Amino acid sequence: MSILLEKIKTLPPNPGCYLFKNTKDTIIYVGKAKNLKKRVQSYFTKRNNLKTAMLIEETQDFFYIITNNEQEALILEANLIKTHTPKYNFKLLDDKTYPYIEITKEKHPQLKISRFKQIPPGKIIFGPYPNLKSTKETLKLLHLLYPLRRCQLASKKPCLHFHINQCLGACAGKTINYKPNIDAITKFLKGNIKDILKKLHHLMQKASEKMFYEKAQEYRDIIDSIKQTTKKQLISNQKLKNCDIFAYAFNQDQIAIQILKIRQGNIVDSYRSVFSYVGFVCENILTYLNCYYQKNIKPDIIITGKNQDENILQQTITNQTLLEQILQTKVNIYHKGDKKKLFLLALKNAQNDLSHNNLIYQSKDQKIQEALNKLAIIFNKDIKRIDVFDNSQLFGKAFVAARIVFNHFEFDKKLYRTFHIKGELPNEYQAFEETLTRCYNKGKEAENDATDLILVDGSLVQLRQSQKTLKKLGYEIPLGALQKNNKHQLTHLVTFQEKLMLEQDPNLFHFLKSLSEEVHRFAVSFHRKTKKKLDYKTTLSNIKGVGVVRKKAILNHFESLEAIKKATLQDFQKIGINQKLFLLIKKSL
């Protein structure tokens, strides 16, 4: 939780969408905010209802996408919820769609509000508009100023709207030229509202001067509706069907990548990454995009724009053809229009990620360094690499152990190791002795020379046993034990000299807790795989007619019991199993 609170401090005050993730890296909630920092902070600082409390309890991390205004954030929120279907979002899971204003393509066209799950080609539409009330008010104004057909043509007499000058008379059999009104409506909905607003302000002022305050308020509401409805939207753009908007920002140490994914005219997702680089920025970006699109579906077109550095821009243009050849998709650099605005939105997010990533990781590294400094004092040695051990078993079955390595401010997964503990019923002390022996025996010196501290799971007794084992192997490495309570919660750091209560040092506690949780995760994950394989072998051993040779053949050919259940007779015949034994195996499972 403290890490999340630190991350919240770096949030921008911009409008946008925020996405909460759980420990499995699954998006569990999407929200929108006028002020990202205030909104996300409110979840963690205010008293919440039960549902919100459950959300916060499950939240492990979050990320966000900046938008230009709250209206864009609202539309983006809907797109993201439909894409990710988060468990804590309900309102938008029913395929809710936002309204559009449509001019129908008929001999006598209508102006109406329409909704689409997927927009049919060829329609004249404007939107989407997240505020239905404002959309209705705007439609009402357009009917008043630029009337089209509002009646059913089946009627043989003029409609009511014709009598109040809001219908041009199709119902009365008149020949009508709709083009001037359609052009005026189109111009208005594309944002050219200056003349109308000027007229409405004049009418509002006149009504106010005559003390017709209700009428003046009515004009005021119409003006607000027009401004709301005609606000330029970037989040939905029906001219862009299937493209990625790519932007990046960089400094001397890191590059931030931002990719906005547009599908069917809507921004449905974003991808972001901040990474350290060596060499030239442009070359790193080319390599990165090549790797990214090998794993992800390529769009019809990748759109980018002018970068912060003119030299980088020239390199990008030079490499444009190369990038197109590598990715087998079109790459365009835009300098104006909506595509440029979308690029600038992606660039804004990339720049924000870059600046705040520095703040987050500087703060994180600083806290880790403080914890390492405290450990250096405790063990009287500079600490850079820490080896952490844990084991996992179920009633003595599938007894396994694991080692993780924390090295130079990060987990070094290349040095992670797992061990199957031998023997029928080993205890924890025997398990650790075997693990340490196999991990630090002769021939492993190069791998373990840099170890500054070893942490084991247990108490002072475990610490002494581990020290004896290491001395036999010729190692003099400082040792500590991570002691937990009966709820498996970390409480103390045990050394040969003292037993430190970690709650008195929150910084050290959070650091050691992260090590403890990582080694526990790694050990339990390996234990589950081992247990599953053991159950698999046991099940096969209990089937009459499956001896050692056949069992080995089945184990080598099929990865799991699930694979056997799905297998056909032909699959078994490939390894010499006849139909009779095949049916017996299937029946036994």
Curated annotation (Swiss-Prot):
Alphabetical keyword list: Cytoplasm, DNA damage, DNA excision, DNA repair, Excision nuclease, SOS response
GO cellular component terms listed in the entry, alphabetical order: cytoplasm; excinuclease repair complex
Any GO BP: nucleotide-excision repair
Keyword ATP-binding: no
Location in the cell: Cytoplasm
Transferase as UniProt keyword: no
Domain GIY-YIG, first and last residues per copy: 13-90
Transmembrane parts of this sequence: none
Main subcellular localisation: cytoplasm
Pfam families assigned to the protein according to its UniProt record, in alphabetical order: GIY-YIG, UvrC_RNaseH, UvrC_RNaseH_dom
UVR domain: residues covered: 194-229
GO molecular function list: DNA binding; excinuclease ABC activity
InterPro entries (alphabetical): GIY-YIG_endonuc, GIY-YIG_endonuc_sf, GIY-YIG_UvrC_Cho, RuvA_2-like, UVR_dom, UVR_dom_sf, UvrABC_protein_C, UvrC
Purpose: The UvrABC repair system catalyzes the recognition and processing of DNA lesions. UvrC both incises the 5' and 3' sides of the lesion. The N-terminal half is responsible for the 3' incision and the C-terminal half is responsible for the 5' incision.
Quaternary structure note: Interacts with UvrB in an incision complex.
Family: Belongs to the UvrC family.
PANTHER family: UVRABC SYSTEM PROTEIN C, UVRC/OXIDOREDUCTASE
Protein's recorded name: UvrABC system protein C
Organism: Aster yellows witches'-broom phytoplasma (strain AYWB)
Gene assigned in the entry: uvrC
